[in-house]
Amino acid sequence: MKHFTTLIVVFVAIKAYLVALALVVPRQYDTSSTLLFPNNRFLSRLVIWDSVFFVSSAERSHLYEHEWAFSWMWSRALGLAGSRDAIAYTAIAVSSLSHLLAALMLRKLTESVFHNKRFAETTALMYILSPAGIFLVAGYTESLFALLSFTGLYLRQRGQYPLAGAVLGASCLLRGNGLLWGIPFLFDLASAIKHNQFNRGVSVVIGGSLVGAVFLYTQYLPWSIFCPERDEWCNYYIPSIYGYVQQRYWNVGFLRYWTANNIPNFLFAAPVLYLMYQSMSTNPSLVPFYTVHAIMGLACVFMWHVQIITRISTCLPTLYWYMAKLAQGYNGHYVVRYIFVWITFQVVMWGAYLPPA
């Protein structure tokens, strides 16, 4: 109970601090949020960047092709809230609450993996202090995606593969990289085959298939809407609208981000990338986790907008295990100081509509 109380106090303090900073940052040059909420300063300062797309799409569903870069399911779910203001408040509330629940689920997952209650509690606390900062407040999908990820991984850890697959499959409705959670099932299947565990193998196949099936549905849905009338990506060998709009509208692709003007973004990402690199482990029982960890890190460096690593890494328990290990060490206070300085800098830049975002 004492640890839970500590988590709640730190959680509320961090959220209040980030929101207060966002409200006092000098007004950004982009007016999208002001046009959406001309008479609501709170929402006009928090619903910016990607949140603008989520709220707009929630009001009228996905209308334009480029909006499919943002979760269709998240927008549809938010749309149930009704009015524009209600949608925005709901997004912020769900994002914030999911952050807390994700920390609690990460604690359960960590204790299940390491059988160390104190380490699990430290991991949960580090997750509350996450470098993702304002992105776990402002109505993005990261918090809920992380909650589903940790829940699914916990169920997998307990051998409940079909249920784990259903939960991790649901994460694919929020973010395409949820497909990567199918990788641990491949390791589990190999283990089941090696040890002649037929029933376990069948259970693993069902769970992994659910992840793949939901991901394929997220690709089929826009294809059924736009194709075959929309040439171009409809005729690709793998007709994925997400990959197409990311490449066309956001210039995502191999080494496309490696330009001189993006050097600051690489510097923004460097601390988290360094922590991810240092945290790598060859412990056989952890290899499935670290395989996903490594793929996401490499994809961010070579394929995606590298600065997003600070927020999309929130689904990686491996990163927070390492941060918890550092926090329990002799110089653990340096980790906490780094996070506090970083999230302060981050929210000021984000609120002024400047990278990293």
UniProtKB/Swiss-Prot annotation:
Lineage: Eukaryota, Fungi, Dikarya, Ascomycota, Saccharomycotina
Family: Belongs to the PIGV family.
Record-level GO BP terms: GPI anchor biosynthetic process
Keywords: Endoplasmic reticulum, Glycosyltransferase, GPI-anchor biosynthesis, Membrane, Transferase, Transmembrane, Transmembrane helix
Name of the protein described by the UniProt record: GPI mannosyltransferase 2
Broad EC category: transferase
Pfam families (alphabetical): Mannosyl_trans2
Pathway(s) this gene product operates in, as recorded in its UniProt entry: Glycolipid biosynthesis; glycosylphosphatidylinositol-anchor biosynthesis
E.C. number(s) listed in UniProt: 2.4.1.-
